[in-house]
Amino acid sequence: MYKVKVYVSLKESVLDPQGSAVQHALHSMTYNEVQDVRIGKYMELTIEKSDRDLDVLVKEMCEKLLANTVIEDYRYEVEEVVAQ
C-alpha cells in the first residue's frame, strides 16, 4: 500500500487573486517581509497498487481529475505504507 501526496498550484503565468489577497492581508498585519503568496491544493491518497503501475496511475488521476493542467501544475510524492 502507498500514500501519495499530491500538490497542485496555479502555473506561474496565471494570476492568483486569492494569493494576492492573502499577501495584502499579511502586509496590513505588518508582515511586510512576505514577497509572494501562491495558493494551492494538497491531497493525500492511499492506494493499493503494485509499484510498477503506480506512477502511471497517479499521473493519469492528476491529469484527468485532480489538476486542471491548462492553468495548474502538479507534483506528487510517494511513500510506501508498511502494514503493522
UniProtKB/Swiss-Prot annotation:
Record's protein name: Phosphoribosylformylglycinamidine synthase subunit PurS
Subunit structure and binding partners: Homodimer or homotetramer. Part of the FGAM synthase complex composed of 1 PurL, 1 PurQ and 2 PurS subunits.
Annotated source species: Bacillus subtilis (strain 168)
Role this protein plays: Part of the phosphoribosylformylglycinamidine synthase complex involved in the purines biosynthetic pathway. Catalyzes the ATP-dependent conversion of formylglycinamide ribonucleotide (FGAR) and glutamine to yield formylglycinamidine ribonucleotide (FGAM) and glutamate. The FGAM synthase complex is composed of three subunits. PurQ produces an ammonia molecule by converting glutamine to glutamate. PurL transfers the ammonia molecule to FGAR to form FGAM in an ATP-dependent manner.
One annotated GO biological process: 'de novo' IMP biosynthetic process
Subcellular localization, as worded in the UniProt entry: Cytoplasm
Disruption phenotype: Cells lacking this gene show a purine auxotrophic phenotype and an accumulation of FGAR due to defective FGAM synthetase activity.
Pathway listed: Purine metabolism; IMP biosynthesis via de novo pathway; 5-amino-1-(5-phospho-D-ribosyl)imidazole from N(2)-formyl-N(1)-(5-phospho-D-ribosyl)glycinamide: step 1/2
